[in-house]
Amino acid sequence: MNGKLYKMMNWPEIEEIIYSDGDNPHRILGAHKVGSNYLVQAFYPDAVSVSVYVDNQKKTYEMELADEAGFYAAIVPYVEKLKYKFIIKDVDGNETTIVDPYSFEPLLEREDFIKFGSGIHYHIYEKLGAHPMRRGGVNGTQFAVWAPSAARVSVIGDFNNWDGRLCQMRRLDPIGIFEIFIPGAKENDGYQFEIKTRSGLVFKRPDPYATESKGENGIISVINKPRSIAWTDQKWMTQRRKFDKDTSSLSICEISIEAFADRHNGKTGFKEITADILEYVKNHGFDTVELMPVMKHVPEHFYHILNFFALDESNGTAEDFMNFVNTMHNEGIRVLLDWVPTFFPKASFGLSDFDGKTLYEYEDPRVGIRPMSGDLIFDYGRKEVTNFLISNALFWIENYHVDGLRTSDISRILYLDYDRKPGEWMPNIYGGNENLEALEFLKQLTENVHKNNPGVLLITKETACWPQVTDSVENGGLGFDYKWNNGWTRDFLSYMRNDPLFRAGHHDELTFSMIYCYTERFVLAFTHEELEKGLEGLYYMMPGDSYQKLANLRLALSYMMVHPGRKHIYMEPDALTIDQAVYIENMLGKLNEIYKTKAALHEADSSNDGFEWINNMAADECMISFARKSSDEKEMLIVVANMAGIEREIEVGVPADGRYTEVFNSDDVCYGGSGLLNEGKLAATRKEVDGRDYSLKLKLAAAALAIFSYVPYSEQEKKIRAIKEEEEIKKEEERRVKLEALKEKQSEEEQKLLNKLKLKYEKELAEQERAIEEKYEKIEEERIFDIVSKEAIKSISSSGKAKTKTKSGKTSGTARGKKK
């Protein structure tokens, strides 16, 4: 080896390159000025020879093999703004000319590091990842990745034979960002990051910021430029800014792309199914379509996201999805995406232990692992992680024009003890169970999305009653636009599952939601979680035979559409039979039309001024009635529902006098019902029912809901009606007076008759008493006579005996005397 060259070289540093142990190869490889020359060093393990061609000098310099591992070096005379290429010859004699990757300065600046480390680099996806570009007249790709715990990071791919010894990256900042520009790496090339830990472990990872991936589980990232199309939705994007989350209608059709695959030979690309989805959504009357995750995910596990920036390849290209959104917008359909910022799967081909240590997830498993599923929770305490998530949200909103995101259950990240037993969770710094870092992340997310994208919606699922989810951040809330009303869904479906015979005992499940209905801006949601197979799932929840199930299905959908709250239904195109599907399509189309055109059903959804119970106490009858109102009293609607399982004729109180017209009845024959309707204009009757002065007589099928529009009388009609009412009142008064006179006359006659009867009775009573007295006297006389007669006889009898005795004594004495 040339002695001068030998002395210039730093052999310990060369070993760092050969063994791929360093994090700053640029300080060794490439051209470095030494005195009046350049020391050019390169590492190509599989090369037989390497030469340097200097563009400035139009001269080639043969490089010496400094180490048999493939380390080459050469001395090149100094020249201003040196430009050079390597000419590499392999064992087969093939020559390849490449521009040295280590001849380029880094693109990331100190401001990027500061913003990223502070969690406020909201377009960091434009800096990290792979970005094809032209630098200094050279085409290639700029790579950057965040891996602070890595000892060495290399880019491997189609452009370097997937060799991790080549294209070793440099660490730019203590924050842990590695970068390199690789000439010749082009669009559609596959790549990965090869990471070596300080313990010597080497493994591969896909790019977290890749916008395209391929291979099983998306393990191969793909280089591509930012995609775009000739957007034609400017009118929609302008109109979107006017959306009022308090007063505007919102009817969401949730779909899974895979559900439409059977109609297209199993293809799930947006290119094939856009027209089908558009027709399906419009025919059912929805104004919004919500897609289950379209990001790269674990097969058959939509919410296990592997690459947050990449569209799942089964759904087609980025342009296909953009055209889908553009088409929907031009037809007046809003597009929402399901988005999962609350967890990610524990998988070696995703974000898990990305740089050899916990990076995107919490280090402590008491915080970082979901107990029930084993999924990993993002480390919201790392600003780089929250920056990743917020920039991802903005990426889909700004690049793909989507109109909003629906996040997965935030309760699982807001509460440190969610699904955890005592001792299995770690309290926050204040000893509480709130995840203060997750709380701050959610506020930062909603603030930044709304700040730059007015009209874009953020909807969330929250199941643990965290307060003020939809209140503004300024007022202490989380800043979401809407929250799923899971309590209503649970209670209502529980009520509807019961046989009508037993619903009376569950009436509170039907009415309880109105107690808390206005504490948040709610979306009433029949989601994929409850229905699984769309309306087929709801159909089989209902009691009874097929006819009764369909009637209860119509009733359930109708009730949801008239209850306060925005609407959300998970739909699958082939879930019901053809006949059932036609009926439900007709009904949902009509319900959505009423919902969107009748202000009473959405204008005051966030205020209790828009709802008034008429009768919520008829538990035994399984019936309810209420009024929906708007700022215009003429827009008032009356809703009556019969859930008893038997037909009923009822009287229902109404808040105002006027004419009422049935604008919807779920039992209409065109919806598959029996046709028991209330036809014509129904004039309110002045009769108190349900505490109201006026009422209607109605008839309802066994399981049916009816909606009545209200038309107040005109001034002329009111005058005529007032005159008629006065006449009616006058007649009523006359009838009352006559009735009272009749009652008085009847009372007098009754009194006369009573007096007459009384006199007769008293006379008869006196005669009876006299007869009784006479009879008694006679009986007494007879008794006394009898007693006297008996005594007299007895006395006479005694007297006769005494005389006989006396006469006998006198005779005896005379005789005795004569003897003397």
Segments from the language model and where they lie:
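Soluble or luminal CAZymes and related metallo-dependent hydrolases
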Residues: 269-273, 320, 384-389, 434-441, ...
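Conserved alpha/beta catalytic core and glycan-binding cleft of carbohydrate-active enzymes
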Residues: 216-217, 221, 401-403, 421-575, ...
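Hydrophobic residues within beta-strands of alpha/beta enzymes
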Residues: 50, 153, 289-291, 403-407, ...
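Carbohydrate-interacting/catalytic domains
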Residues: 1-248, 270-282, 550, 561-752, ...
